From Swiss-Prot:
Keywords: Amino-acid biosynthesis, Aminotransferase, Histidine biosynthesis, Pyridoxal phosphate, Transferase. It is an enzyme of class 2 (transferase). It comes from the Bacteria. Pathway: Amino-acid biosynthesis; L-histidine biosynthesis; L-histidine from 5-phospho-alpha-D-ribose 1-diphosphate: step 7/9. InterPro entries: Aminotransferase_I/II_large, HisP_aminotrans, PyrdxlP-dep_Trfase, PyrdxlP-dep_Trfase_major, PyrdxlP-dep_Trfase_small. This is Histidinol-phosphate aminotransferase. NCBIfam families: hisC. Its EC number is 2.6.1.9. Homodimer. The modification N6-(pyridoxal phosphate)lysine is found at residue 231. It catalyses: L-histidinol phosphate + 2-oxoglutarate = 3-(imidazol-4-yl)-2-oxopropyl phosphate + L-glutamate. Belongs to the class-II pyridoxal-phosphate-dependent aminotransferase family. Histidinol-phosphate aminotransferase subfamily.
Length: 370
């Protein structure tokens, strides 16, 4: 290493240099059941129609008015309440970054805090670290429910600027008790904090917090709703969105980079919303398939526990997660070994809910690998 390269590396923050880049497991030639992707491709006639739409775009121009059209289409799709506004992101990951950026307090001598139940989505603590917020992790119960007393105590102690509640949660696929969630929201609001309801997996859940936001707008005036089109069926189209009271959302809009959503992503999302019934039918099929998958897992000898699911994933506990993961990988099935992510996830694997054929192959590989 040259002196100049070493000196240049010294300019990189020590905490960043100590990190590991997010690794995507190689998936060539394997059944990919590790990332909660929709297993169904677009029907051929829709593929052709989308290709024509994308081919006609003016790629030499920056994104423009079609982003306004997309916001309007998304607002209609979710039934966005009056007085709400929306921010678009290059995936919900970017939305999480924008929220942290907007709430950080650099140069003030006062560090803002972000709080979330754990185990949860890895981007919450990562965004807090990178944007200079303190991250407060509150463990779930052993059954992956909200520990309400612990949450209320942590909120009172740390007064978080942002509290994330994944609804349903990843990687546990749990949808927490409405009353407990509302009391956590109330507590965060009493401390002047923002609550973000992360509904990435809403197409597979039995309820949405948006209903409570409509029914009790004053009580939920500090609540923002975050969703993504990834689980809608467009993981390859990076598009997330944040909706909530305009006074809050418009402040987040100020830190959004210009042109962060490409014309290709925008047009693909608009096309998908025009054919929302196709994706709704796919989600309904996956919910039905999930019921059969959970039953098959609970009947499988050697499985220690299978948790109920409100998402397109199922969490299972096995005698040896590392051995089962490697055995399945050797059998060309890739799942997510989450056993080292958090002590509560000991010996756990996270399985994607796929098509009937995919699930059958995954079950065979799991049974042979226990």
């Amino acid at each position: 290493m040259t002196d100049t390269l070493a000196a240049a590396l010294g300019r990189i923050r020590p905490d960043v240099r100590a990190m590991h880049a997010y690794a995507v497991q190689p998936a060539t030639g394997v059944l990919k059941m590790d990332a909660m992707e929709n297993p169904f491709p677009l029907p051929p006639e829709l593929q052709e129609a989308l290709g024509r739409r994308l081919g006609a775009l003016a790629l030499n121009r920056y994104p423009g008015a079609r982003l306004t059209d997309l916001k309007s289409a998304l607002a209609a799709h979710i039934g966005m309440p009056e007085g709400f506004s929306m921010v678009l992101g290059n995936g919900s990951d970017e939305i999480i970054t924008l929220l942290a950026l907007a709430c950080a307090r650099p140069g003030t001598g006062e560090r803002a805090a972000m709080l979330a139940p754990m185990p949860g989505f890895v981007m919450y603590p990562m965004s807090a670290q990178l944007q200079g917020l303190d991250f407060v992790a509150v463990p779930l119960t052993a059954d992956f429910e909200l520990d309400e007393p612990a949450m209320l105590a942590a909120i009172a102690q740390h007064r978080p600027a942002i509290t994330y509640l994944a609804y349903p949660n990843n990687p546990t696929a749990t949808l927490w008790d409405e009353g407990a969630v509302q009391r956590v929201i109330d507590a965060a609001g009493a401390q002047g904090g923002i609550v973000v309801m992360d509904e990435a997996y809403q197409p597979f859940a039995s309820r949405t917090w948006l209903d409570r936001m409509r029914a009790e707008p004053v009580r939920n005036a500090h609540v923002l709703l975050m969703r993504t089109l990834s689980k809608f069926g467009l993981a390859g189209v990076r598009l997330g969105y944040l909706a909530g009271p305009a006074a809050l959302v418009d402040e987040i809009e100020k830190v959004r980079p210009p042109y962060n959503v490409s014309v290709l992503n925008c047009e693909a999302a608009l096309f998908a919303l025009e054919h929302a019934r196709v994706f709704a039918a796919q989600a309904a099929e996956l919910r039905a398939v999930r019921t059969r998958l959970v039953a098959a897992l609970r009947a499988m000898p050697g499985i220690e526990r299978v948790w109920d699911s409100e998402a397109n994933m199922v969490l299972v506990r096995v005698p040896d997660a590392a051995r089962a993961f490697e055995g399945m990988k050797a059998r060309k099935v890739l799942v997510k070994n989450v056993s080292t992510m958090h002590p509560l996830l000991a010996r756990c694997l996270r399985l994607t809910v796929g098509s009937e054929a995919d699930n059958a192959q995954m079950l065979d590989a799991l049974q042979a690998s226990l």
